[in-house]
Amino acid sequence: MRSSFLVSNPPFLPSLIPRYSSRKSIRRSRERFSFPESLRVSLLHGIRRNIEVAQGVQFDGPIMDRDVNLDDDLVVQVCVTRTLPPALTLELGLESLKEAIDELKTNPPKSSSGVLRFQVAVPPRAKALFWFCSQPTTSDVFPVFFLSKDTVEPSYKSLYVKEPHGVFGIGNAFAFVHSSSVDSNGHSMIKTFLSDESAMVTAYGFPDIEFNKYSTVNSKDGSSYFFVPQIELDEHEEVSILAVTLAWNESLSYTVEQTISSYEKSIFQVSSHFCPNVEDHWFKHLKSSLAKLSVEEIHPLEMEHMGFFTFSGRDQADVKELKSIQSSCQFHCKLSPDVVFSNNMLNRETEVSNFLRDEANINAVWASAIIEECTRLGLTYFCVAPGSRSSHLAIAAANHPLTTCLACFDERSLAFHAIGYAKGSLKPAVIITSSGTAVSNLLPAVVEASEDFLPLLLLTADRPPELQGVGANQAINQINHFGSFVRFFFNLPPPTDLIPVRMVLTTVDSALHWATGSACGPVHLNCPFRDPLDGSPTNWSSNCLNGLDMWMSNAEPFTKYFQVQSHKSDGVTTGQITEILQVIKEAKKGLLLIGAIHTEDEIWASLLLAKELMWPVVADVLSGVRLRKLFKPFVEKLTHVFVDHLDHALFSDSVRNLIEFDVVIQVGSRITSKRVSQMLEKCFPFAYILVDKHPCRHDPSHLVTHRVQSNIVQFANCVLKSRFPWRRSKLHGHLQALDGAIAREMSFQISAESSLTEPYVAHMLSKALTSKSALFIGNSMPIRDVDMYGCSSENSSHVVDMMLSAELPCQWIQVTGNRGASGIDGLLSSATGFAVGCKKRVVCVVGDISFLHDTNGLAILKQRIARKPMTILVINNRGGGIFRLLPIAKKTEPSVLNQYFYTAHDISIENLCLAHGVRYVHVGTKSELEDALFVPSVEEMDCIVEVESSINANAIVHSTLERFARQAAENSLGIVSASSFLHPMIKNVLLCQVSGIQYSQYRVKLCDRPTICSDEFSQFHREGFILSLTLEDGSIGYGEVAPLNSNVENLMDVEGQLQLVLHLMNEAKFSYMLPLLNGSISSWIWSELGITASSIFPSVRCGLEMALLNAMAVRHDSSLLGILHYQKEENGSAQPHSVQICALLDSEGTPLEVAYVARKLVQEGFSAIKLKVGRRVSSVQDALVMQEVRRAVGVQIELRADANCRWTFEEAREFGLLVNSCNLKYIEEPVQNKDDLIRFHEETGLPVALDETLDDFEECPLRMLTKYTHPGIVAVVIKPSVVGGFENAALIARWAQQHGKMAVISAAYESGLGLSAYILFASYLEMENVKASTEQKQGTPPSVAHGLGTYRWLSEDVMMNTLGIFRSPYSGFVEGFIADASRNLKDVKINNDVIVRTSKGIPVRRYELRVDVDGFSHFIRVHDVGENAEGSVALFLHGFLGTGEEWIPIMTGISGSARCISVDIPGHGRSRVQSHASETQTSPTFSMEMIAEALYKLIEQITPGKVTIVGYSMGARIALYMALRFSNKIEGAVVVSGSPGLKDPVARKIRSATDDSKARMMVDNGLYIFIENWYNGGLWKSLRNHPHFSKIAASRLLHGDVPSVAKLLSDLSSGRQPSLWEELEDCDTNISLVFGEKDVKYKQIATRMYREMSKSKKSVNNIIEIVEIPEAGHAVHLESPLRVILALRKFLTRVHNSSTETELSQKLLLALKEM
């Protein structure tokens, strides 16, 4: 017997296993599970060497007992994980891992123990099962196993039907043993655990067994055997992970050399038994491979596996503990040559020889042989059409244990179903039909399969030869019935025992070889039968079975086909491929065109090809990457330029004339877009390289110059090995700019339309898809709409982290359709087949005519065989809507179109569904569609979703979108062309760079109290800031920041944000495309500044946008209007010279007094007046004023009212009824409740305008505005400084204009600078509206009087320039003149008399302070920002690996409230230490006590008073400790993502041991590898999504003394610091607990801390608050600095006020005592 391991005792596993011997399985009752999204382990155990069976390290475990002896020595080993670049194939992934290990051998680890994991992403369907089955039965390496992830009734048959994802593993990296904490002599022992918080390490094993050193297995309660494989392939939906794990421990006599030697045995075996050339058709070999598993399966036994999980349910919140282990009940595991466990993996059916010899007659023998050979070839899915002639084939298929049969009465639908199955499974389905026209009905599907290269096996029954041509029933000529559309035809003779059955088998084998060859396609076997209905026994000679003994003794096909290839063929680049590679290398303007792709391996390869070439990528909707899911950090990256909207861009003549390529590579099949094809024709000649695996000609335009017959994987391999230099052309930047502009425009137009449109369906459909779903698109309009209006979207899948580190920026979505012949027949049936084949949840979208063309497909849908539920969208526009978009529609009579093209109908789809028993849902609105797509059905059932549409409305929508796409393309191209001509591009990207920025605070006098102020307001002045932005060429742009001092923002908070903006904008770069607005500025703010646009105060964003746009205008020698409204010179349309101004009237006084003022305004030249209402005792009084004003000004003057949400509904209704005769243009916000706005209009008839309602939206107002499309809402009043700048204002205005509403720009008492910008912006909106109306032939819209009359309140101005608002000599009305406004903004002259102060940013003073602690001098790096007259000081402490630098942006933001100081905590950054102690103590102990003492002494040097201490993570623990222990010096503490430490002794011991191990890992492997592993943890998921994550991670490398950083990690471990939980309720310091919304762990900790602190306060004035920062994770201050600044400023103010009150109280009390 061989020796083996003693293994662990997981306390959470049942121990009910009886004794058993090897090769026997045990029945255990366990609840079935669903696999988690990720498999992770927290604490594992054991180290011990096995000499013969499975060498490896052993750890204690797999989990520490609750009553562990705390006197034990504890060691925790950290796994170091290295992620390699993604591999093109599984084989190349192995090579990548080999190279990594070879490098490790040349530079072996210096540590005496360790665990290393190398992992690489490989294509998702890497075939773990086949790789496992390829291993030799006499394996030299153990354990070796396969574990299925199938959780729904797994069985041997399900391996064929479902092809489940699974795990293959081999070798033993380490295993786990359970051991007592004392030895036999009672001495304490060293316990060793494995702890990993980031790697995807998984342990596998069995509970309640003892696998001993003699390689025997016994049942033993409390024992278990778990191991981590040395080599592992783990398959997921999105990606597969191939990994190698190595472990060593020299103290247990297992060295690095030994573990590498063991690995080499494992890698040699798996590499030697790996057949890449059969990967494409591995299903042919599955049955024979599974047959090799010769172990007898007696009873089911579940194989346990466990993963890493975070546990926080005990007293402490950061202890990790294993949860209950998930289990699988389909597996095969060889622990040794003699110990094998298996369940649901083996076939226990009767041998083939028996059932063939037992057949009743020769017909049954041949039929059974055909079906058996099909199953051996991997064909297990049979589509059976009922019929007498095919009865023997149907019965044989139905009775075979491995087949899945589907029956349908309609052969046509059945055949299309088989096509769909081939698309999804990549293997043929078998179609069985009777004779006659049943065969003919297959022709449409055969044509589609032939044209789309889909494998299909047709078994058509037939009459025997003697009944042919003699008028026999159902006898037609079936010889070569499908002509050239099949790859192979053979007419079998009628069954007879005179012909060896071998002939039948070789014919089937040959047919499948043709079906799956390089030109895949349908094959046809015609099968004549005599007496097909006679099942009675007849004598037949078994001699026909001669020669089948070997075949009947195994599970392999009779004839196996092999293609001999050189093992070096992929790496050789000779002959023609060398010529092609040279063409690619010399390309200057390359384009990668990705056509239709069926396989995930090829989609994966196309992504890696795009990543290597770095060319612009145009992806067809059927490519799988057109509707990709983007990982958030890559949304703004330039690495992959997918030009998704090239089809839209080509509507523009300018774009068509611009584009030219010198090399185009097309991988995949046909492309959908006709305009892209036309573009290629126009660009020709160029080198056109077409790559496809079939040899057929696919070149309708006759452009292909280089035809490569190869699959995409092979071609990509050649390209990837060549390593081409990257060239980024100017065209590359142009296409990127075009695509971004059009994408934003299409998104806006589709979303802004209130009704449900067909483009909206395509747009939302793409967002609803996930990696676990797939899309089947119907022909005609659906595929064109999805190709044009589908979009990529962000993804948050669990594999994101892996694919990010693997440098793959996106995840694909499997998409298919019937594009071989592009017919509309059989689509529903094809979609159901696709769902069966791909094993995913399929969404299908078809038109109504396509649906009606295949209603028999509902019968197949109803059967729901072997697939997941489907959602089928039927776009019902009552006919063939595509013809309405064709030129013929303009020249043909409507009656002819309706009858012969549209084929209009009134068929009820609902009734059809009802008749077939299929669930039906009707949607007519956007929200209903979203519910149907996004809200999961409680019932797991299929659903037909009918989307109501109309042909004419759809045509109008498409025409409108085409027009706006063309405009967006023209505008963006105009900006790009002008910019690139005037200024050189930075690395071929159009960017400006900021060279300087400053702001000045102003204070101007007003001549009256603003109408926004209360009656108590008596100071007539306006305060704000002027932002000045200088570009690298000296161009200067000005912007105004004018907060209204509301509850949203005030002057002090705004200045804090401005200071941060100044810091972030230093040398920032921005694109010339910002003037396109429509999301471009928001994207830039996030990608360049690293802050979300929604976190910026509206007035700050408005001023920033104003400055940016004005600077760009100056740079281009243009104006704000000129860059917003790009217009070609040859266009010739004159720009407006002015915009009308609406006067503002505060309705104080009697009705006659107000009317008098109104009359004076009319005399001054105002054509419109807005009255403020809602200020009086009752609305009746306001109505009387309005009536009097109307009488005074006459009917020609436009009157508006503004109630500012002051009235109840009843009050507003009363006003509305009284002023109905006053002909008001509108009233703004008449009611307090926004839900009453439409009701108010309906009951009063008074038009309503939105104003304050617009203030409530955040980043996307369109969804909110959808509620206000009612015609009674006639206008939107937009204050740019309130809604957040020009981009948001333009978005709202465009929505309003699109829905026929007025867009009125309104000022908020800005200075002349802001008013000048608003004049130009209002003019831009007017011009856009005129342009849109003209193109829609709606006539010229009336001019709008904009709400800029607040200029009359200005007693003085910020600018010395004359404000260009005066009475026009031409119109006689008061207007804002564009020329004056443009001139003012181009040459701004600041009135220094109103400037209070100017700031170019807060300077940072950097210096060192020395503090002496415990015989060491610590020279602490200090960053000092700001001065505060009142003496407030805030000390900022960074987290582990950080430095004081990371706090500087926030410190600048709150420097106006306090002097801000950050430090490099001892051991970090540039802080250093010098020893004055004995030589034996060369480094200090960085304990909590030592750090706190050092900082305390530092504070004493900084200030004699108290400080508020702000700490993040590790710094937060220090801050809390100091707040509790040094309250005499600390007046407040802000604990950001921090904790009080650990209370549980076991948790403390584990955590300190874990941190010790991490410290050793840092010293042994270096800081770079440590940081790579550190930030792979789940705690940092949100931070990894930040656009500046790479920069943040790089900043963590800037530490001068890495050993000190490592020592601090150990010494300051939360397991060693004093637990502060017991002290919280005695805290007498002001505390603010801050955490991120996404940081679940620290949110729970903060909540618990808050409860503890709130129990008892020592002072009634103490502040205890809890603050949640939206849209942020653990690193709150880095992810959302503006919101942190706001929270800190408020807390510091409260602390200061509280301290002041306390001092006053103490003085008062002292005075009273003295009295």
UniProtKB/Swiss-Prot annotation:
Consists of a fusion of four bacterial genes, menF, menD, menC and menH belonging to the same operon. In higher plants, the C-terminal chorismate binding domain is absent from the isochorismate synthase (MenF) module, leading to a non-functional module. The isochorismate synthase activity has been taken over by ISC1 and ICS2. In green and red algae lineages, this module has maintained its structural integrity and is functional. The lineage of its organism: Eukaryota, Viridiplantae, Streptophyta, Embryophyta, Tracheophyta. The gene is PHYLLO. Disulfide bonds: none annotated. It is found in: Plastid, Chloroplast membrane. SMART domains: MR_MLE. InterPro entries: AB_hydrolase_1, AB_hydrolase_fold, DHS-like_NAD/FAD-binding_dom, Enolase-like_C_sf, Enolase-like_N, Enolase_C-like, Mandel_Rmase/mucon_lact_enz_CS, Mandelate_racemase_C. Disruption phenotype: High chlorophyll fluorescence and lack of phylloquinone. This is Protein PHYLLO, chloroplastic. One of its GO terms (cellular component) is chloroplast membrane. Its EC number is 2.2.1.9, 4.2.1.113, 4.2.99.20. Residues 1435-1540 form the AB hydrolase-1 domain.
